[in-house]
């Protein structure tokens, strides 16, 4: 039986704000897994689930939940800013984000978004 592979995965290495960074994106049937590391490990695992749209805004709200690692407010903000576009572009699928970064500035978020976009599997 030929057809679409069960898993689609892409990876890219780039220098983000002077730090070597690896990004791996893998598409599963119900989730997109995004691994972003500058430390060579998976780090904090965050689940981003889209909620149902109840207003005329049109975009679902992403609910974040730290599954593994430090559950700090900055982690939730960073995760939403980093991968909200992945969920939207993937038809509002849930995203699992594994995050181990040194730099959590907005400059780093924008640069990391470009690397994630280059690994598009959705």
UniProtKB/Swiss-Prot annotation:
Single Gene Ontology BP annotation: chaperone-mediated protein complex assembly
Keywords per UniProt: Acetylation, Chaperone
Keyword Acetylation carried by entry: yes
Any one Gene Ontology cellular component term annotated for this protein: protein-containing complex
Keyword Chaperone on entry: yes
Gene3D superfamilies reported in the protein's UniProt record: 3.30.230.90
Taxonomy, superkingdom: Eukaryota
Primary role: Chaperone protein which promotes assembly of the 20S proteasome. May cooperate with PSMG1-PSMG2 heterodimers to orchestrate the correct assembly of proteasomes.
Subunit structure: Homodimer. Interacts with PSMG4. Interacts directly with alpha and beta subunits of the 20S proteasome but dissociates before the formation of half-proteasomes, probably upon recruitment of POMP.
Family that this chain belongs to: Belongs to the PSMG3 family.
Protein name in UniProt: Proteasome assembly chaperone 3
Originating species: Bos taurus
Highest classification ranks of the organism: Eukaryota, Metazoa, Chordata, Craniata, Vertebrata
Gene, per the UniProt record: PSMG3
């Amino acid at each position: 039986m030929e057809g679409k592979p069960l898993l689609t995965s892409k990876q890219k290495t780039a220098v983000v704000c002077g730090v070597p960074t690896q990004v791996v994106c893998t598409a599963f049937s119900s989730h997109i897994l995004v691994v972003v590391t500058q430390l060579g490990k998976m780090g904090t695992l965050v689940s981003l689930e889209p909620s149902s749209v109840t207003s005329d805004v049109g975009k679902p709200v992403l609910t974040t939940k730290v599954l593994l690692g430090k559950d700090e407010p900055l982690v939730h903000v960073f995760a939403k800013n980093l991968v909200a576009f992945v969920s939207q572009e993937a038809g509002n699928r849930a995203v699992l984000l594994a995050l181990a970064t040194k730099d959590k500035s907005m400059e780093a978020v924008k640069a990391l978004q470009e690397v994630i976009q280059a690994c598009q599997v959705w």
